[in-house]
Amino acid sequence: MARPDLHERISSLRKLRVAQERVRVRRQVGRRDGVRLEIDGRWLTGFCSNDYLGLSQQFEVVAALQDAAARDGAGATASHLICGHHTAHETLEREIADWLGYPSALLFGSGFIANLAVQQALLSEEDDVCVQDRLNHASLLDATRLAGCRLRRYPHLDVEGAMRQLKGAPEGAAMLATDGVFSMDGDVAPLRALSLVARMQHALFYVDDAHGVGVLGPQGRGCVADAGLGVAEVPLQLVTLGKALGGYGAVVVGEEALVRHLAETARPYIYTTALPPAQVAATLAAVRLARRDDWRRTRLVELIGAFRDGARKHGFELMASDTPIQPLLCGEEATVMAMSAALEHAGFMVGAIRPPTVPEGKARLRVTLSALHTPQQVQALIEAIVQARDVVSRQPLRASA
């Protein structure tokens, strides 16, 4: 039997994506100014980034990056366990651990890498199992597959389903893993109930709070703190640095013994160059602002309320989200692509989310809000969405990139 040719395979897959009108296109951003971004020579108001607190261009954050780069250079030059672990890395780990009320923290290059590291280091036996919400982020699901343990999934937010899956896999060590805030729906996991399930089934409870930390809870400490939980109930938690904190990278906080085990055994940690010290210095400045500036979260809450009230007034189907992620269901791919194009024509950049990222028939506009948005910009967006809906409803639809 002839060996499959990889070039022929990818050519066939490309043709299939073209036929399904699911080709993905990168849009090039020329410049950014707050929530405004220049694309193809036009300035658009963006409602599509994860810069929830507006920290990515904050003066103190940028100045910290510039100062550290002038002092330490552009990169860490080695992995953490060789000579890449700088004072800046240690300081940031301690700051985030203190902020979230955890004894220990460990920096990673990205949330995807961190999720792989956690599962690869902890679920190393064939009988081990990771039970997950069906709508968890791809990095959590892929991490289980790459770690080699068993993957069991339960219906979205279904606590009893999580219990059934754990009971059905009594052999081996177990982890119950969930997003804190779900990135495509914007809703929040029932963490208190899930923590009880994990305890009853002797499973380690792991929360990926990429979209919660900085936004929810006291001092922006995230979903876990907002639910009144801590390290006793959630022994490991993921924090990404590229969402509300406006930078890049990730941190796993947790029990000291667990974090030490990750540092000593997790291959994605051991065999990766450490984050640039300048980037880490910028994130440290962002963390301190996020802890201090409650006004950013207060403004976000006001903007979220204004958007939901306006969208509801005009008959849009909202999802159960009180977070900066505000999806508007459009149904078919052709509809959401036409809506997104109409909004761009009106001067707004809003992400069109379609299968396979979301289920068939659940395509949506993913509106994301920032503390830097103004009430006037939110109102203008709502009016533009209404106009886009009216235009799209009167024309034949065809999905496009």
Curated annotation (Swiss-Prot):
Q: What family does the Swiss-Prot or TrEMBL record give for this protein?
A: Belongs to the class-II pyridoxal-phosphate-dependent aminotransferase family. BioF subfamily.
**Naturally occurring in which organism (per UniProt):** Xanthomonas euvesicatoria pv. vesicatoria (strain 85-10) (Xanthomonas campestris pv. vesicatoria)
> Would you tell me the protein name for this molecule?
8-amino-7-oxononanoate synthase
* Catalytic activity, as annotated: 6-carboxyhexanoyl-[ACP] + L-alanine + H(+) = (8S)-8-amino-7-oxononanoate + holo-[ACP] + CO2
Give the keywords, sorted: Biotin biosynthesis, Pyridoxal phosphate, Transferase
Q: GO MF annotations for this entry? A: 8-amino-7-oxononanoate synthase activity; pyridoxal phosphate binding
Kindly give the HAMAP family that the UniProt entry links to this protein: BioF_aminotrans_2
Quaternary data: Homodimer.
Question: Quick one: which pathway?
Answer: Cofactor biosynthesis; biotin biosynthesis
Q: What is the lineage of its organism?
A: Bacteria, Pseudomonadati, Pseudomonadota, Gammaproteobacteria, Lysobacterales
Would you indicate the residue range of the signal peptide? none
